[in-house]
């Protein structure tokens, strides 16, 4: 029997917090989902100029500092309010640009990022620890991801998926047979998934085991150009390929395929076990994970920005429409809650933390917006080594504990008083409690939040 400890917001936590947004699209599964709430209306807090265009995405580490790469081949570490610069790392010896790469943070605050030529590892204070390969021989555009085994994975135009140890040694390279122009993702089982582009049909979606062996391959009818996969709570893989959106089961079999009105050039956001959001062309789509498209909201532009979802289900996304580019907050029912004219293309995908929401623009600028829910304790819902999650989150009462098993759970009120207890069960019933944000601590994982509506 495993034990899950549920604490109400405001109760002191002794365990270290995890990174609120640890890598591209938040976590190694690319869920795009946060356990923090931003809400609407949005207020612009800061717009900070950098030394180059920001087409990659920011990440937020556990102390609130924001890291982002720019096309001037520098990695910036900014204060939580973007008003201070902790350090900047010059990566020009390792490439000539940072295209769409977001940093990836490990548990020690070390940083991995790809330039257009190499994978670079830096310490928490911006010192380069190593780079790979030793020469600028690769062509890389997208983000690395850290696996459950600590290895770092990235794909490139040279037709291979690479795995490196934390010490910078090549563990293996898997030949994909064609180019990869998107970021790999880590499945709940630890396998690595990567999509392909260029050439002619079919375009393989690969599932590679952590030791470099092929687990399965599923052929897609469209190419995944700028389209990275995301993994759902049940292990299903969601991937846009040209004008199709695919759901592929964790065993490699097709669950469904839906046709959209435009090419998908971003990563889906998995709001919960039944809902995901994806951008295709000028539209934001809400998709039922069983039955397909629920609604489409026009947001304008031809977009590369991957949407992000907060703990209340609000969706945040930017557009690339030149001087008409906007940043949107959209409710789960497709209602526009707020939008702000930014005036420059937003290719960067937003990152959510307790401080607010961050994104960059092609006008060399990083933005911080806050909403009514900003300022909460920094925390995110980690999958952990076993893929453990509380589902659905947000919830209206009953929360299922995944993966399936028998758990002992205790629930405390704001004063730390035990108000409920569950023994040897696979779910928690919070329906007798008032609405609010609860802190969840799982032995062996970081504390996280569950929102009771």
Regions found by a protein language model. Give the residues of each.
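Positively charged, low-complexity intrinsically disordered regions
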Residues: 3, 63, 149, 219, ...
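Secretory-pathway ectodomains
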Residues: 17-374
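Extracellular low-complexity Ser/Thr/Asn/Gly-rich intrinsically disordered segments
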Residues: 374-380
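C-terminal outer-membrane/trafficking sorting elements
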Residues: 380-453
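Bacterial N-terminal signal peptides
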Residues: 6-14
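Positively charged n-region of N-terminal signal peptides that target proteins for export
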Residues: 1-4, 452-453
């Amino acid at each position: 029997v495993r034990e899950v400890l549920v604490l109400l917001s405001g109760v002191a936590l002794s365990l270290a917090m995890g990174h609120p947004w640890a890598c591209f699209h938040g976590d190694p599964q690319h869920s795009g989902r946060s356990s923090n709430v931003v809400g609407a209306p949005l207020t612009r807090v800061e717009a900070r100029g950098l030394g180059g265009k920001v087409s990659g995405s920011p990440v937020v580490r556990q102390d609130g500092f924001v890291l982002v790469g720019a096309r001037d081949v520098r990695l910036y570490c900014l204060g939580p309010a973007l008003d201070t610069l902790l350090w900047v790392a010059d990566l020009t010896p390792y490439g000539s640009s940072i295209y769409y790469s977001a940093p990836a943070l490990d548990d020690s605050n070390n940083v991995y990022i790809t330039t257009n030529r190499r994978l670079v590892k830096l310490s928490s204070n911006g010192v380069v620890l190593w780079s790979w390969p030793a020469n600028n021989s690769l062509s890389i555009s997208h983000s690395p991801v850290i696996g459950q085994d600590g290895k770092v994975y990235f794909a490139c135009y040279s037709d291979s998926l690479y795995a490196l140890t934390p010490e910078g040694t090549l563990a293996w390279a898997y030949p994909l047979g064609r180019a990869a122009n998107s970021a790999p993702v880590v499945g709940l089982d630890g396998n690595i998934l990567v999509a392909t582009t260029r050439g002619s049909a079919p375009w393989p979606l690969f599932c590679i085991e952590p030791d470099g062996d092929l687990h399965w391959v599923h052929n897609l009818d469209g190419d995944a150009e700028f389209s990275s996969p995301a993994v759902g709570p049940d292990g299903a893989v969601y991937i846009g390929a040209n004008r199709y959106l695919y759901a592929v089961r964790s065993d490699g079999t097709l669950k469904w395929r839906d046709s959209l009105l435009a090419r998908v050039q971003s990563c889906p956001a998995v709001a919960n076990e039944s809902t995901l959001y994806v951008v295709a062309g000028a539209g934001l789509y809400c998709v039922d994970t069983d039955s397909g498209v629920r609604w489409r909201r026009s947001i304008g532009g031809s977009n590369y920005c991957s949407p992000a979802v907060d703990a209340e289900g609000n969706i945040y996304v930017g557009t690339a429409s030149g001087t008409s580019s906007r940043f949107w907050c959209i409710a789960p029912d497709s209602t526009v809650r707020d939008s702000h004219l930014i005036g420059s293309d937003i290719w960067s995908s937003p990152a959510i933390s307790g401080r607010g929401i961050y994104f960059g623009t092609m006008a060399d600028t990083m933005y911080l917006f806050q909403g009514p829910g900003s300022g909460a304790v920094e925390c995110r819902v980690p999958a952990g080594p076993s893929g453990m999650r509380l589902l659905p989150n947000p919830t209206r009462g009953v929360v299922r504990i995944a993966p399936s098993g028998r758990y002992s759970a205790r629930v405390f009120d704001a004063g730390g008083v035990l108000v409920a207890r569950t023994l040897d069960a696979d779910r928690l019933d919070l329906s007798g409690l008032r609405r609010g944000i609860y802190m969840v601590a799982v032995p062996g994982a970081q504390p996280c939040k569950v929102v009771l509506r």
